[in-house]
Amino acid sequence: MTSTGDSPSIQSLRDLREASCGPVGGAAEGSPTVTNDLSENVILTSLDDLHNWARLSSLWPLLYGTACCFIEFAALLGSRFDFDRFGLVPRSSPRQADLLIVAGTVTMKMGPALVRLYEQMPEPKYVIAMGACTITGGMFSADSTTAVRGVDKLIPVDLYLPGCPPRPEAIFDAVIKLRKKVGNESVSDRRQLKQTHRYCTIDHAMVPVEPIVTGAYLRAETQVAALSPGVGVPMAAPEQTESAEPVSSGASS
């Protein structure tokens, strides 16, 4: 490429850039300096980085608390933990939220309402399953006929937060991990890889299993052997005493 007229050549521009990046006269050799060159004061970024930075810095959660796990999340609203530093602004409408925090037991009757709230949230949206009851059903998963064995059977879950209940510090750790996930996403990839099977569209079918608590432990061999000495002891008949004065059944005339 040849330069025409008064336009500077590529080599002259490179020399000017190297000269501007060098130390200023009178400054110590190797000390950091601020240059006046425009190329040294411009930060280059991408659309994905800018978009992800804006989203991870302003997550608006929709709090869906159904049990005791929500009490631990309510502690974050106070001044001790101050979760506002992460840009979390609780919303009461799913149309204004992009993060759904499910804390507590999800029942069959609340399942359709939860799915409806999730579908009303705009894309991109994320879900945090908080607590053992939300993830696996918890202590209600043994013999309950109304508890859902994991909220991921109804809606997709981006992050699982185990605990019974999780501490507020664990909730902060979950939010930080979710921010890292948001920061590594791409707008084009999310549009192309939009899942169509994100949640179950059929009714939650429960598999019949044998009950765990049946009361049969009272009829176990070891229990019978332990109770046999006491069972074989004859019981003494209760003592009967007769009253000397008859009991009147009515008022005397």
Curated annotation (Swiss-Prot):
Location (main, coarse): membrane
Spans through the membrane: none
Metal-binding among keywords: yes
Location of this chain's protein in the cell: Cellular thylakoid membrane
Record text on cofactor binding: Binds 1 [4Fe-4S] cluster.
UniProt KW keywords: 4Fe-4S, Iron, Iron-sulfur, Membrane, Metal-binding, NAD, NADP, Plastoquinone, Quinone, Thylakoid, Translocase, Transport
Keyword set includes Flavoprotein: no
InterPro entries for the chain: NADH_UbQ_OxRdtase-like_20kDa (IPR006137), NADH_UQ_OxRdtase_20Kd_su (IPR006138)
GO BP annotation list: aerobic respiration; electron transport coupled proton transport; photosynthesis, light reaction
Catalyzed reactions: a plastoquinone + NADH + (n+1) H(+)(in) = a plastoquinol + NAD(+) + n H(+)(out); a plastoquinone + NADPH + (n+1) H(+)(in) = a plastoquinol + NADP(+) + n H(+)(out)
Disulfide partners: none
Molecular-function GO terms, alphabetical: 4 iron, 4 sulfur cluster binding; iron ion binding; NADH dehydrogenase (ubiquinone) activity; quinone binding
Topological type in the membrane: Peripheral membrane protein
Cofactor(s) the record lists: [4Fe-4S] cluster
Binding site for [4Fe-4S] cluster: C68, C69, C133, C164
EC number: 7.1.1.-
GO cellular component terms given for this protein: plasma membrane-derived thylakoid membrane; respiratory chain complex I
Homology family: Belongs to the complex I 20 kDa subunit family.
Subunit: NDH-1 can be composed of about 15 different subunits; different subcomplexes with different compositions have been identified which probably have different functions.
Cited HAMAP family: NDH1_NuoB (MF_01356)
Job description of the protein: NDH-1 shuttles electrons from an unknown electron donor, via FMN and iron-sulfur (Fe-S) centers, to quinones in the respiratory and/or the photosynthetic chain. The immediate electron acceptor for the enzyme in this species is believed to be plastoquinone. Couples the redox reaction to proton translocation, and thus conserves the redox energy in a proton gradient. Cyanobacterial NDH-1 also plays a role in inorganic carbon-concentration.
Protein name: NAD(P)H-quinone oxidoreductase subunit K
Organism: Synechococcus sp. (strain CC9311)
